[in-house]
Amino acid sequence: MYGRLREIDEAIAAGREALEALEDAADSLDSAKRWGIVDILGGGLITSVIKHSRLGDANHALADARVALARFSAELDDVRGVAGLTAEVNRWNAFFDIACDNWLADIFVQKEMSDAADRVDEAIETVKRAVRRLEGARRA
């Protein structure tokens, strides 16, 4: 009984660690999207650089999340589908966005950021559900 509880506690801890990293990524993506809107409205080169910096922050957080999700998935099969998350923007679009700094490039990058944010939000919900089930199993 105590061994099972310990395993559940370890899985819950891994899930919470993954959630924290995913939420950090979501925050960075939200920041990048806000900078993206400013960029679309004529923010300029500095705005593009800040936006891509926030995307880099999101990718670092997602790398941390992948490690935590791998640990979590060793305990729980439900999260295997979210292990390949990334907030990468197509390199050509990133170059085009910074070098040309026009509204068309800004819109392409904004769409990629929104898609990445949607995937991260789905992963957060998947992990939250799994953690809630584990917490329920622990109480049972």
What does each model-found stretch correspond to?
Residues 1-140:
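A composition-biased, non-transmembrane "mature-region" signal
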